[in-house]
């Protein structure tokens, strides 16, 4: 029996913000993963909140998407 992933609500907020930024720019998730230099599976886990994005991943997402880290973490506090 496969274990269900535990969703971290804080990670989910960041994932939704990254997803929204990518969609607004018309990016595909494979393209975003490639430009961030991460595996698609890793990006998917970050976007769904299954895993908390690393600080380095957050910086990369911010740079690649041209969006501030503040915008990507909006709603955490």
Task: Describe each PLM feature range.
Residues 32-33, 61:
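Short alpha-helical "recognition helix" segments of helix-turn-helix
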Residues 18, 29, 55-58, 69:
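Helix-turn-helix DNA-binding elements, focusing on the entry/boundary residues of the two helices
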Residues 50-63:
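Short, basic-rich loop-to-helix N-cap that marks the start of a DNA-contacting helix
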Residues 66-77:
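Short C-terminal boundary/hinge segments that cap the last helix of small helical domains
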Residues 38-53:
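Recognition helix of helix-turn-helix/homeodomain-like DNA-binding domains
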Residues 1-26:
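A short, Lys/Arg-rich alpha-helix, primarily the initiator
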């Amino acid at each position: 029996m496969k274990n269900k992933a535990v969703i971290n609500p804080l990670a989910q907020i960041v994932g939704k913000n990254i997803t929204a930024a990518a969609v607004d720019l018309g990016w595909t998730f494979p393209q975003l993963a490639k430009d961030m230099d991460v595996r698609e599976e890793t990006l998917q886990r970050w976007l769904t909140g299954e895993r908390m994005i690393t600080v380095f991943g957050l910086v990369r997402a911010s740079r690649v998407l041209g969006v501030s880290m503040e915008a990507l973490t909006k709603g955490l506090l």
